[in-house]
Each structure stands twice: as structure tokens, then as C-alpha cells.
A protein has these predicted regions:
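Terminal leader/tail segments of proteins
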Residues: 1-134
Length: 134
């Protein structure tokens, strides 16, 4: 039985600067993610144009280059279904990471950071808070 190597670490974090509740609600509504089965997935630091594929068992959600905006620290965001596991494949590193539905739980925001130095270059942060874009 092949054991898949884990290329990421996970944490839950809510103690950072966030937007107001009102702004957060509007953001979720604009992305049609204001119901329990959806969350927003963010790619943040460390992405330099590499092609990323995001999928679940129902659909391919996103396939494109992802580049971090140096001023905001954000790269790309999208709505995902939290009732399904989400697979993220980085074509540059040929590594797959997973946002597991049981880990997401009630969290509305999932941030993925990349730092190619270590054995686990990706950090997944589950949060109830939306970080400001500025």
C-alpha cells in the first residue's frame, strides 16, 4: 500500500488583522459563498506564476498560473465546496496538497502559502477571518 507523502502543514488561526464583519459578509455574498457548503480558498505568499490546478471529485475548479501580488500578499482566490475534499496540484513542484472537508468544518476562509525551502513547502491556514487586501 502506497502511503502518500504529506507536503503541507495545517493550522487554524483567527488572531490577525481582519476586515469588518460587514465587509466580510458582503465578500462572501459576492462570491456566492454565504451558505455553509462553501468557503473561499486563497493562494497567498510564494507563488510566481506556476500553473496550479484545483479540483474536487465533481469538477475542475481552476487551472491557471498563480502569481502573488507583492503589495497585498495575495495571489488568487476562489469558491470551493467544503462538503468535498479539494485537491490542489502545483505543476512546478509536481506536488499535491489537500483541503479536507472534515478539516474545513465551519471555517469560511482557507489560505495557502508556499515556501519552497522545506520538506513541506505549503502551509494551509483555516480561518473565520477575511484578511484585508491592503
Amino acid at each position: 500500500e502506497k502511503v502518500e507523502k504529506i507536503y503541507y502543514t495545517e493550522q487554524t488561526k483567527n488572531d490577525f488583522r481582519a476586515v469588518s464583519e460587514k465587509v466580510q459578509k458582503k465578500f462572501l455574498k459576492d462570491y456566492k459563498a454565504d451558505t455553509p457548503e462553501y468557503a473561499i480558498l486563497f493562494f497567498t505568499k510564494g507563488f510566481n506564476g506556476e500553473k496550479i490546478e484545483v479540483r474536487n471529485e465533481e469538477e475542475i475548479i481552476f487551472v491557471d498560473g498563480v502569481t502573488t501580488d507583492k503589495t497585498t500578499g495575495l495571489a488568487k482566490n476562489m469558491r470551493i465546496k467544503v462538503t468535498l475534499d479539494t485537491e490542489i496540484y502545483d505543476k512546478a513542484t509536481k506536488k499535491k496538497i489537500y483541503v479536507k472537508s472534515d478539516k474545513v468544518g465551519k471555517h469560511k476562509f482557507i489560505y495557502i502559502m508556499k515556501d519552497t525551502d522545506g520538506e513541506q513547502p505549503y502551509k494551509i491556514t483555516y480561518s473565520d477571518k477575511l484578511r484585508p487586501a491592503k
